[in-house]
C-alpha cells in the first residue's frame, strides 16, 4: 500500500467554502449593526431641539444595546485573517462608529428631517385654522339721516340729479355730512328712480287689454219655421221692451137705444143682440134702417183701395173679429 500523501490546505475545500459564506454573513451583520448604532448615537439637530438636553451618562447608558453589539463584533473574525486565507476574494472591513458614511451625508439627512418636521408643523397649523371658525368682518354701521337732511337732499335731487364735486362739498357742509355720504345718497336715489321706471314699464306691458262690452240680447220673433209662416200659430212671445197686448173692451162704448149690449169674448169676437127685423124679403131696407153691417176683418182689407199697400198683413190672421 502506498502511504497517504500529506494533506495540504487548499482554498477550494468544502470547509473553506463554508467558512467563507459564514464570514460574509458575519461581516454583513456587523455592517448593519454599525449603521444602527450610528443612527442611535447621532440624532438630528431638529430632534435634539424638540427635547430637553440631559446630562451625558456614557455610551452604555445612551444606547442600551451597545454591549451586546460589541460582543457580537468581538466574536466575528478579523478581516486580516480572511484576507490571508482568501487572497483573491474581496475583503470587507467593518467601518468604525466614528467614521462618516461616504454614501450618506449627515448634513443632507438633517436637512431632510428638518424639512419633514416643518411640513408636519405646517399641516397641523392648517388643520387648526380650518377647525377654528373665521371671525366675521365687522360691517360699518349704516348712516342714519335726519328728517331735515333727507328733506333737503330730496329737494336738491329734484332740482339737480347730478352734483359736481364743489356742489357736493358745499351741500355736505350745510347738512353736516361728508362728501362721500352725499355722493352715495345721490347714487342710491338715482338707482331707486331707475328701478321705479322699470317696474312701471313692466306693469304697462304686462297689463291685459280691457274686456269688450257685453253683447246685448235682443228677442227676435220666429217668422218662418220649416218654410211656413208661424207668427199666428206660434205662442205670443214676450217683447224686449215689456209691452203687453191686452184685449180691447168693447163694452166701454154706450149701447145704442133699442139694442142690447154687445157680449164680447176675450177672443175678439162680439155678438150683438138685434131687434126683430123685417121679413127676409126686405134685408137691404132693414140694413139701411139699422145702419149695422156684420162683416169680417178680411172683408175690410178687401175694401181698401189697391193703391195703398197693406202694411199689416197679420191682421187677417186674427179670426173671429167682427166690427160694425
From Swiss-Prot:
Belongs to the NK-2 homeobox family. Changing residue 114 to R: In ASD7; somatic mutation. Changing residue 7 to P: In ASD7; somatic mutation. Keywords: Atrial septal defect, Congenital hypothyroidism, Developmental protein, Disease variant, DNA-binding, Homeobox, Nucleus. Residues 138-197 bind DNA. Changing residue 194 to R: In ASD7; somatic mutation. Changing residue 322 to Q: In ASD7; somatic mutation. Changing residue 126 to V: In ASD7; somatic mutation. It holds the Pfam family Homeodomain. Changing residue 133 to S: In ASD7; somatic mutation. Expressed only in the heart. Changing residue 279 to F: In ASD7; somatic mutation. The keyword Ion transport does not apply. This is Homeobox protein Nkx-2.5.
Amino acid at each position: 500500500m502506498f502511504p497517504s500523501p500529506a494533506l495540504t490546505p487548499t482554498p477550494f475545500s468544502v470547509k473553506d467554502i463554508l467558512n467563507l459564506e459564514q464570514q460574509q454573513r458575519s461581516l454583513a451583520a456587523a455592517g448593519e449593526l454599525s449603521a444602527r448604532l450610528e443612527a442611535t448615537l447621532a440624532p438630528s439637530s431638529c430632534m435634539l431641539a424638540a427635547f430637553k438636553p440631559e446630562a451625558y451618562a456614557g455610551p452604555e447608558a445612551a444606547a442600551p444595546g451597545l454591549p451586546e453589539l460589541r460582543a457580537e463584533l468581538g466574536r466575528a473574525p478579523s478581516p486580516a485573517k480572511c484576507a490571508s486565507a482568501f487572497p483573491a476574494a474581496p475583503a470587507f472591513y467593518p467601518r468604525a462608529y466614528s467614521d462618516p458614511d461616504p454614501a450618506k451625508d449627515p448634513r443632507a439627512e438633517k436637512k431632510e428631517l428638518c424639512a419633514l418636521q416643518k411640513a408636519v408643523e405646517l399641516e397641523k397649523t392648517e388643520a387648526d385654522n380650518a377647525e377654528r371658525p373665521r371671525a366675521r368682518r365687522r360691517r360699518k354701521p349704516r348712516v342714519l339721516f335726519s328728517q331735515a337732511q333727507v328733506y333737503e337732499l330730496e329737494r336738491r335731487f329734484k332740482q339737480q340729479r347730478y352734483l359736481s364735486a364743489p356742489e357736493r362739498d358745499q351741500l355736505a357742509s350745510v347738512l353736516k355730512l361728508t362728501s362721500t355720504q352725499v355722493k352715495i345718497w345721490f347714487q342710491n336715489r338715482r338707482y331707486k328712480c331707475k328701478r321705479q321706471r322699470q317696474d312701471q314699464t313692466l306693469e304697462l306691458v304686462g297689463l291685459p287689454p280691457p274686456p269688450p262690452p257685453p253683447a246685448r240680447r235682443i228677442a227676435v220673433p220666429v217668422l218662418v219655421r220649416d218654410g211656413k209662416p208661424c207668427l199666428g200659430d206660434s205662442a205670443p212671445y214676450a217683447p224686449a221692451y215689456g209691452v203687453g197686448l191686452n184685449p180691447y173692451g168693447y163694452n166701454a162704448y154706450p149701447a145704442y137705444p133699442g139694442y142690447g149690449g154687445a157680449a164680447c169674448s176675450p177672443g175678439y169676437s162680439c155678438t150683438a143682440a138685434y131687434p126683430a127685423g123685417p121679413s127676409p124679403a126686405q134685408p137691404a131696407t132693414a140694413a139701411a134702417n139699422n145702419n149695422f153691417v156684420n162683416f169680417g176683418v178680411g172683408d175690410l182689407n178687401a175694401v181698401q183701395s189697391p193703391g195703398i199697400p197693406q202694411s199689416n198683413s197679420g191682421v187677417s190672421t186674427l179670426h173671429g173679429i167682427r166690427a160694425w
